[in-house]
């Protein structure tokens, strides 16, 4: 029998809500839920609650939405909850040392990588971007550094050759809650030995940008193909076709014996099987894309109306009308 813990949960998006759901179903007591303030959303810009707040209210849990945790009032409010531990999952606010030290057992974080690899903001996307063959979820004890705390639990999962950030996000969102509950139970029973991270092996997962999604055809076809998967569903890779940015959703590498620099971005062929484009190394076959104002479509549907955009010899990435 695990000794039930008094838990504060802090998180904001769906990924966090799945972990909160697991805690609600556990034998532990949730004494407070922290989430980002409601934000304007949709065309009407009406205030929208986070997925975590909505779930907490469904279960009549007390919700707190401070703009910052750095004030004395925020610290006093949290301290009054008399929590044993605080669980932080994709919360979005910085936790100062006073907050980290407030719960009896400190604060735990669920991070979407096998630490110390991919510390930082975009671990799921960067694992695909780099061509990693596996990733996972690390439960760690938080300190003042950026994802530098001692590791308490690691669960691993493979990254498939067709993995997108959306599909990997779902895998880790399924993997994390069970890992979190196991960790909390073992911590409550004194069965965990924290493992320090090897800082020398660490690297950082910087945020994605729309600029980075603009395809650089001088890159290898393999890197571009990984970018397409890593940047799906956001910001989505794109290139200029017919004078407008066109999003690329699916493609695969076509090996070539040699690559010519003047073929970077050049359409080598186009038919119902795909548009083959020269790259810095090998070539890329585009099979699904999305012109402005349209839904994503198979290449055959695209060619029915826009074949003139990808005639052989055309250079993609240039503003050719």
From Swiss-Prot:
Reactions catalysed according to its record: L-methionyl-tRNA(fMet) + (6R)-10-formyltetrahydrofolate = N-formyl-L-methionyl-tRNA(fMet) + (6S)-5,6,7,8-tetrahydrofolate + H(+)
Organism: Pseudoalteromonas translucida (strain TAC 125)
Keyword Iron-sulfur: no
Signal peptide residues on this chain, from the entry's feature table: none
Enzyme Commission number(s) from the entry: 2.1.2.9
GO CC terms: cytosol
Role description: Attaches a formyl group to the free amino group of methionyl-tRNA(fMet). The formyl group appears to play a dual role in the initiator identity of N-formylmethionyl-tRNA by promoting its recognition by IF2 and preventing the misappropriation of this tRNA by the elongation apparatus.
Pfam families according to UniProt: Formyl_trans_C, Formyl_trans_N
HAMAP family on file: Formyl_trans
Protein name per its UniProtKB record: Methionyl-tRNA formyltransferase
Taxonomic lineage: Bacteria, Pseudomonadati, Pseudomonadota, Gammaproteobacteria, Alteromonadales
PANTHER family: METHIONYL-TRNA FORMYLTRANSFERASE, METHIONYL-TRNA FORMYLTRANSFERASE, MITOCHONDRIAL
EC class name: transferase
Family under the similarity heading: Belongs to the Fmt family.
Annotated keywords: Protein biosynthesis, Transferase
Binding site for (6S)-5,6,7,8-tetrahydrofolate: 113-116
Organism domain of life: Bacteria
